[in-house]
A protein has these predicted regions:
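Ser/Thr/Pro/Gly-rich low-complexity linker/stalk segments immediately outside membranes or between
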Residues: 26-40
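A generic local structural motif
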Residues: 46-50, 78-79, 175-177
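A short beta-strand-turn-helix
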Residues: 42-59, 84
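Short clusters of hydrophobic/aromatic residues that line enzyme substrate/ligand-binding pockets
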Residues: 50-52, 133, 196
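Conserved strand-loop elements at the edges of beta-sheets that form or border functional pockets
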Residues: 54, 63, 198
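Short secondary-structure boundary/capping elements
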Residues: 43-44, 74, 170
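C-terminal cap of thioredoxin/glutaredoxin-like
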Residues: 1-22, 27, 146-216
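Structural alpha/beta surface segment adjacent to cysteine/selenocysteine redox centers
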Residues: 57, 62-68, 73-149, 154, ...
Length: 216
């Protein structure tokens, strides 16, 4: 009996120690991420990035995303819902972070579509049909391009812009900013320059609503 009590006591102590250590680690990570964003506030958002919502909205959600990312596709309608729920108060800005193999060519398509004012229709189409142009977490650019051909878009201009220096520079800047901010996975969200340190849709909503309460 004494051995059983000793075993249980030891297990409880170890469990509590693990929980405490995990909490401390999470707190340290959150502090680090916030300090990193504060020290590099000028690279979180970039003028000219695709955006949706009122231009004068006081709340800006910046999303570093990969079009081949399944979680990004799942969050796409959820972020749209936030913008609709708070009209005029919230906008979203998209930053390219092509982590998946082959995604670099797909983000070039999106940026080329952006030059024609078709970024959002293109992104919606790609996310809605993501399983058709990705294989085992690898993007298939040819299939993605074929899909985008169904849009009312200048296809020849799209293909020209895809490989242009202008598009390449935008993507390079986004990737460099993501590296500076130590974005390691997508989607990564920032709300008014502050990182979402605990990932989740409910956590994102809470952060946005807190920002709205402060701004309005």
């Amino acid at each position: 009996m004494n051995k059983k009590i000793l075993f249980l006591s030891t297990a409880v102590i170890l469990s509590l120690a693990f929980v405490a250590a995990t909490s401390i680690f999470q707190a340290q990570q959150e502090t680090k991420e916030n300090e990193l964003a504060n020290n590099n506030a000028d690279v979180v958002s970039r003028s000219g990035s695709p955006s949706k919502g009122a231009a004068d909205a006081k709340i800006t959600i910046v999303e570093f995303f990969d079009p081949a990312c399944e979680t990004c596709a799942q969050f796409y309608p959820l972020v749209n819902d936030i913008i609709k729920k708070y009209p005029g108060k919230v906008k979203v800005e998209m930053r390219h972070t092509p982590f998946h193999k082959g995604a670099d060519k797909v983000v070039a398509m999106l940026e080329a579509a952006h030059l024609q004012g078709k970024f959002w229709p293109a992104l919606k189409l790609l996310f809605a049909n993501q399983q058709g142009w990705t294989r085992h977490h690898t993007a298939q650019p040819e299939q993605a391009l074929q899909l985008l051909s169904s849009l009312a878009i200048d296809k020849q201009q799209l293909q020209t812009d895809m490989v242009s220096e202008k598009v390449a520079n935008v993507i390079s800047q986004d990737v460099a900013d993501a590296k500076t901010l130590e974005v390691r996975a997508t989607p990564q969200f920032f709300v008014n320059g502050k990182p979402l340190t605990r990932f989740g849709y409910r956590e994102l909503i809470d952060m946005v609503e807190d920002a709205i309460a402060l701004a309005y």
